[in-house]
């Protein structure tokens, strides 16, 4: 088949007949094909060529074969045309050759349509070997879309491809290979009037032209191929890929595309002339493609190995780089370690050197220490021997001093010094005992407070958690109710006036009713938590907490009350404790408000329950409706809005208190309280320790001061004494002058006043600290039935009594030295120390006249004590005084013993009068003895000084008595001539009024003593008479009792005998014997009744008329 020549006009415009046929074909195809839009060239080498000469123009068939794939449009779902087709530029659609209309003949040229030209470059080249693009130096995966999409017109009729990306896998990115879509063969199908050709994307294509070709077309095709190869080479020179392989593949791709296009056209041209040659060329082409595929597979494997090796090299290089960095870092650290090691080595050498020097020094010092130790041991032995010698000398001198002191005390009659020492020793012992007891009690109470506070904290935390749990439950349920009612409100508002259907095919009103009932039940349960038994249990728990808190606060206040200052002020911890109690009361108030709902919960919850109840009632009426009633729903909607407001208020007031109350949140307040309690316990422990130390320090100071004052007193009281026969006479300048003696006495008095004030104040303070503790201990011991429960309280009173005795003794000593009465302690201080009753009894003793009223003492005080020397009492006077004292004591004891004997024996019906008489006799005897003793003491009160006075005669009667200084003094028993024997008459001196007053008192006392003696003798006589009467009455009673017992025994014996006789004769005598038996029983009973009045009548006679005493 030869190719027909085509004129120049035929290349641009078809002939007249062909144009008519083309128009008819366009009209036919207008209904089945969409309008083809103009498209730009898909590849750079398909751009329009520059204008050539007429001999070198591209034939029409070549242009159509090159452009039909690019200008192919999508295949519609229906063959109906949507738009009028538009003829492509530079060529008109041509009619399908007849050879393609017959299936048998079409099969011979099937190889022309099995391998269509692909614009994607897939299936005919090796472009799939590199599908990873490099954009700005970074690898980007190539998307599955046609190449050069950016150059494609946005108005193209081609079907757009959906962009796809690879999913993330475990395979590294550098191993991802993405291939282009392959190209499948074209398919033909017969239409009613023509045959259509489609590709794999359902695009309509033109059949290859079977028009005979000419040699010119072959030459032109060759020129076009050369031009395209030349242009492809120029473009490849401008292309720069990431690697040489990419550049090679780009060249192969472009050249293969050109070869594929030209080869396809050659096969078509050959097939026109000879179908067999075309088929052979097609087979050769297939083999060529298979060969390229085989090469491609080999290149793929090579590429994989290459990429793998490159990645391995890259990883190895990275590891080498990292290894190099690690080596550098390790080398750097090694250098630092070596430098540090060198430094340490130098320091170690230096330390070793210093250590060696220190060892040498230590050895030297050890030798020196050994020498010193030996020296110390020797010196200690000598010192111990010296100390033993000194202690022995001290003991000897102490015993000698003690014996001398006793002799001096007996000689100078300073018995009060011994009493002063014993009082001080007793006071010191009791004070130390109570200080230790106070410290022990405080320590035990502090431990108890710590335990109780810990227990209180645990209970409060547990109570707080319960309250918070309840409030959290109320809050959660309130939120559930709020969300539920809002949900139903929105549901019914959206379906107002409509038929309401829910997926469960149940009535929405029934579901809403169940929900509202559930809401009502939930709120009802929450309301019960603020009333009834639940609230009472909460109050009970809070009461337990309050009681526990009151226990440890009471113990704390008790500890602080025992640690007042000397001025009676409480420690600052007491005020701190009061602040804690106030804050705790605020905490209790807050919890009370929260558990009983006074913050508003107790008002809101009932309103919510009532509103829900009304809604439930309304919803029950909705069950018969299929639509939401408008009027009834408006009422429910109004109630729901009201409930929403109440629920919002409820959520805001939970876990809060009213705004009017100034309170902190419960958790913060409790934490603050715990911190305050911890600080208070620390302060309380410090206060107890410091208080004990202060008490012991003050006691030691008082002890030393009292001992020092007693030593100073003895030094001043003992006068200077020299003996001409034994000791040389001291110089006058070394003797103590009267002025120095008076100054010493004044200093002693001043020190005594200050010391007494301190001692009384300290004793009162210690007594006030311990009295509450001692009382509590006494009550506890009494409750446990222990022996002597009030022993500690008695010891505490003894401590104050010892203190007062010391002060009183000190007052007597100072008064004796000063020559006038001196009171070191006022009545108010004594009352504070001993109490009102005891102070009145001791301060104003009615039995002993005050020192101011003692005439003889006043006479003695007018002269200095160191110039007075009392003459020794004669032995006869001492004996008489002792006998008088013993006689008075014996008389008193005899009278008292007789009275007690009479009282003990006065028992029975006849002892009342005798007991009364005995009591009167006892009283009279005691009064007489007391008067006699008082007279003797009063008579002894007039002490006569021994200053150069005449000694009493041996025949004169004297009496011994104990004066206030506890020394034994003697004075004449009868003092009528006491002033006339050796002193001037009282009428001539200033003592006359005093003397007359004393004499009147003595005469009055003598008369009173005589009267008391008479009454005592009468009482003794009467006592004897009453005793005899009592004795006879007792004997008479015993006789009568004995007679009565004998009479009862005889009566009982007779009744038993007669009873036995009656039993034996009962059958014969019958009822008559019973009467006789009753008559025989009557005499003993009547005799017994007669005996009783006789005894009763005789008893008064015995009581009133005493019988003579039997001999």
Swiss-Prot record:
Q: Where is the composition biased (Basic and acidic residues)?
A: 1060-1078
Determine if Coiled coil is one of this entry's keywords: yes
Record's InterPro entries?
Answer: Axonemal_dynein_LC_domain, Axonemal_dynein_light_chain
Q: Phenotype on deletion? A: Mutant mice are viable and show no abnormalities. However, Axdnd1-deficient males are sterile with reduced testis size caused by increased germ cell apoptosis. Testicular late spermatids are deformed with abnormal manchette structure, thereby causing male infertility.
Alphabetical list of Pfam families matching this protein: Ax_dynein_light
Tissues in which the UniProt entry reports expression: Highly expressed in testes. Mainly expressed in the round and late spermatids. Expression is detected also in the brain, lungs, spleen, and intestine.
GO cellular component terms listed in the entry, alphabetical order: ciliary basal body; cytoplasm; cytosol
Give the protein's biological function: Essential for spermiogenesis and male fertility probably by regulating the manchette dynamics, spermatid head shaping and sperm flagellum assembly.
Kindly provide the name given to this protein in its UniProt entry: Axonemal dynein light chain domain-containing protein 1
């Amino acid at each position: 088949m030869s190719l027909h020549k085509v004129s120049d006009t035929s290349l641009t415009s078809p002939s007249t007949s062909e144009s008519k046929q083309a128009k008819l074909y366009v009209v036919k195809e207008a209904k089945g094909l969409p309008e083809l839009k103009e498209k730009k060239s898909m590849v750079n080498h398909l751009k329009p060529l520059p204008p050539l000469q007429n001999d070198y123009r591209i034939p029409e068939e070549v242009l159509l074969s090159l452009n039909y794939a690019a200008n192919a449009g999508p295949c519609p779902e229906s063959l109906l045309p949507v738009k009028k087709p538009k003829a492509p530029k530079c060529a008109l659609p041509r009619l399908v050759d007849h050879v393609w209309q017959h299936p048998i003949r079409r099969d011979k040229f099937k190889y022309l349509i099995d391998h269509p030209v692909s614009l994607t470059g897939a299936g005919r080249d090796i472009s799939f070997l590199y599908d990873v693009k490099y954009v700005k130096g970074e690898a980007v995966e190539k998307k599955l879309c046609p190449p050069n999409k950016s150059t494609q017109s946005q108005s193209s009729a081609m079907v757009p491809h959906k962009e796809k990306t690879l999913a993330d896998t475990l395979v590294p990115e550098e191993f991802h290979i993405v291939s282009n879509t392959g190209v499948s063969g074209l398919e033909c199908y017969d239409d009613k009037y023509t045959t259509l050709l489609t590709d794999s994307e359902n695009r309509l294509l033109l059949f290859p032209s079977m028009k005979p070709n000419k040699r010119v077309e072959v030459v032109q095709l060759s020129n076009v191929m050369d031009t395209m190869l030349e242009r492809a080479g120029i473009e490849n020179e401008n292309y720069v890929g990431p690697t040489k392989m990419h550049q090679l593949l780009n060249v192969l791709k472009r050249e293969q595309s050109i070869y594929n296009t030209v080869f396809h056209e050659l096969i078509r041209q050959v097939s026109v002339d000879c179908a067999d040659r075309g088929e052979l060329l097609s087979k050769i082409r297939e083999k060529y493609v298979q060969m390229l595929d085989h090469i491609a597979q080999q290149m793929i494997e090579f590429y994989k190995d290459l990429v793998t090796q490159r990645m391995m090299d890259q990883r190895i290089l990275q590891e080498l780089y990292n290894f190099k960095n690690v080596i550098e870092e390790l080398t750097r650290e090694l250098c630092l370690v070596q430098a540090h090691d060198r430094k340490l080595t130098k320091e170690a050498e230096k330390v070793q050197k210093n250590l060696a020097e220190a060892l040498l020094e230590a050895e030297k010092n050890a030798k020196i220490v050994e020498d010193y130790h030996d020296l110390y041991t020797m010196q200690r032995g000598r010192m111990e021997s010296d100390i033993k010698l000194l202690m022995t000398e001290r003991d000897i001198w102490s015993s000698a001093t003690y014996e001398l002191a006793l002799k001096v005390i007996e000689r100078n009659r300073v018995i009060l010094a011994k009493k002063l020492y014993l009082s001080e020793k007793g006071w010191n012992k009791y004070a130390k005992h109570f200080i230790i007891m106070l410290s022990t009690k405080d320590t035990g109470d502090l431990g108890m407070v710590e335990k109780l506070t810990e227990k209180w904290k645990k209970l409060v935390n547990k109570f707080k958690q319960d309250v918070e749990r309840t409030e959290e439950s109320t809050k959660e349920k309130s939120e559930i109710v709020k969300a539920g009612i809002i949900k139903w409100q929105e549901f019914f508002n959206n379906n107002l006036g409509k038929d309401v259907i829910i997926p469960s095919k149940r009535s929405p009103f029934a579901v809403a009713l169940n929900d509202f009932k559930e809401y009502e039940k939930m709120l009802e349960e929450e309301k019960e938590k603020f009333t009834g038994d639940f609230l009472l249990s909460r109050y009970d728990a809070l009461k337990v907490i309050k009681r526990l808190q009151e226990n440890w606060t009471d113990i704390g206040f008790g500890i602080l009350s025992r640690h007042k200052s000397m001025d009676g002020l409480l420690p600052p911890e007491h005020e701190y404790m009061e602040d804690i109690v106030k804050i705790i009361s605020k905490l209790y108030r807050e919890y009370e408000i929260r558990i009983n709902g006074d913050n508003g919960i107790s008002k809101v919850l009932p309103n919510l329950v009532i509103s829900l109840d009304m809604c439930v009632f309304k919803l029950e009426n909705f069950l018969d409706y299929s639509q939401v009633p408008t009027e009834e729903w408006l009422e429910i909607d109004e109630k729901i809005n009201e409930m929403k407001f109440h629920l919002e208020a409820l959520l805001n007031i939970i876990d809060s208190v009213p705004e009017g109350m100034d309170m902190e949140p419960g958790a913060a307040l409790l934490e603050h309280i715990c911190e305050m309690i911890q600080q208070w316990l620390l302060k309380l422990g410090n206060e107890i320790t410091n208080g004990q130390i202060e008490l012991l320090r003050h006691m030691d100071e008082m002890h030393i001061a009292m001992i020092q004052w007693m030593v100073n007193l003895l030094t001043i009281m003992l006068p200077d004494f020299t003996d001409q026969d034994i000791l040389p006479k001291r110089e006058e300048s070394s003797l103590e002058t009267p002025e120095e003696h008076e100054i010493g006495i004044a200093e002693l008095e001043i020190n005594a006043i200050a010391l007494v004030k301190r001692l009384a104040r300290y004793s009162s303070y210690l007594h006030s600290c311990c009295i509450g503790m001692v009382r509590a201990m006494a009550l506890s011991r009494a409750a446990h039935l222990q022996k002597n429960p009030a022993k500690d309280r008695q010891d505490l009173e003894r401590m104050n009594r010892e203190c007062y005795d010391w002060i009183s003794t000190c007052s007597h000593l100072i008064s004796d030295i000063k020559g006038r009465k001196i009171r070191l302690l006022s009545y108010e201080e004594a009352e504070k120390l001993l109490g009102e009753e005891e102070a009145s009894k001791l301060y104003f003793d009615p039995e002993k006249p005050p020192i101011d009223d003692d005439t003889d003492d006043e006479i003695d005080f007018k002269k200095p004590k160191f110039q007075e020397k009392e003459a020794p009492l004669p032995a006869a006077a001492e004996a008489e005084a002792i006998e008088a004292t013993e006689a008075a004591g014996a008389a008193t004891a005899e009278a008292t013993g007789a009275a007690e004997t009479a009282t003990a024996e006065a028992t029975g019906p006849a002892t009342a009068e005798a007991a009364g008489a005995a009591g009167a006799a006892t009283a009279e005897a005691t009064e007489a003895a007391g008067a006699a003793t008082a007279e003797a003491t009063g008579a002894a009160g007039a002490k006569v000084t021994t200053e150069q006075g005449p000694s009493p005669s041996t025949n004169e009667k004297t009496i011994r008595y104990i004066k206030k200084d506890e020394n034994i003094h003697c004075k004449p028993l009868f003092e009528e001539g006491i002033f006339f024997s050796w002193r001037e008459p009282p009428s001539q001196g200033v003592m006359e009024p005093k003397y007359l007053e004393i004499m009147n008192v003595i005469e009055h006392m003598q008369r009173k003593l005589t009267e008391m003696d008479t009454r005592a003798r009468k009482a003794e006589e009467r006592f004897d008479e009453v005793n005899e009467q009592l004795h006879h009455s007792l004997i008479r009673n015993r006789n009568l009792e004995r007679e009565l017992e004998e009479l009862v025994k005889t009566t009982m014996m007779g009744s038993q005998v007669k009873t036995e006789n009656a039993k034996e004769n009962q059958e014969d005598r019958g009822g008559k014997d019973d009467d006789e038996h009753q008559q025989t029983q009557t005499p003993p009973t009547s005799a017994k009744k007669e005996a009783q009045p006789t005894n009763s009548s005789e008893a008064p006679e015995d009581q009133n008329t005493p019988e003579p005493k039997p001999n």
